[in-house]
């Protein structure tokens, strides 16, 4: 006994899309006037990989503590620039985000020929924090030149630009525009799309 059904044509090497006749009609109309994503002039990236989030993603209280442990005003300014706001997949909502007041200690590994690697010796308060996690961070696979550095990220500069982000996995397509300076973590739920129009 058939209660509901729809005819779906699966031609050649095209991806399978199961839609009602009305949805198929809408899809065809969109495809005739739109540009496929593969033809856009964009780059799609994942978020930052830390290898050990417990050490590199911190609360606002921990950030304030690290900043208060800086010995000089110069160290404090450098450290403020190093610790950036971060969003996780679960922070992304439909058309917006709810920042959980979490921060990324962005001890990046640099970009060859363009951006030097972060030298932890220039950030004693950050080093003191990360030293508490030494046994975990020293053996992680996702690390840079030293255990204090995050892994190489060729698109590091793109995290400083405004971007459209969306969760890769979820019940709904949640996407939003993120202002410059906010990083995103790759919790397997997040992709970053840097648009040239910004």
Where are the regions that the model predicts?
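Polybasic, glycine- and aromatic-enriched phosphate-binding surface used to engage nucleic acids
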Residues: 3-198
């Amino acid at each position: 006994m058939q209660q509901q059904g729809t005819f779906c044509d699966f031609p050649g090497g095209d991806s399978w899309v199961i839609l009602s006749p009305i949805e198929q009609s809408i899809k065809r109309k969109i495809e005739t006037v739109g540009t496929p994503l593969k033809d856009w002039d964009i780059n799609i990236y994942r978020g930052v990989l830390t290898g050990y989030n417990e050490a590199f993603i911190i609360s606002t209280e921990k950030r304030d503590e690290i900043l208060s442990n800086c010995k000089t005003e110069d160290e404090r300014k450098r450290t403020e620039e190093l610790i950036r706001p971060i969003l996780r997949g679960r922070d992304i909502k439909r058309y917006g985000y709810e920042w959980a007041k979490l921060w990324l200690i962005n001890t990046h590994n640099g970009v060859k020929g363009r951006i030097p690697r972060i030298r932890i010796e220039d950030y004693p308060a950050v080093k003191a924090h990360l030293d508490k996690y030494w046994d975990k961070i020293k053996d992680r696979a996702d690390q840079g030149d030293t255990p204090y550095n995050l892994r190489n990220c060729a698109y590091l500069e793109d995290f400083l630009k405004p971007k459209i982000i969306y969760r890769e996995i979820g019940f709904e397509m949640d996407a939003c525009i993120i202002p410059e300076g906010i990083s995103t973590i790759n919790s397997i739920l997040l992709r970053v799309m840097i648009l040239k129009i910004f």
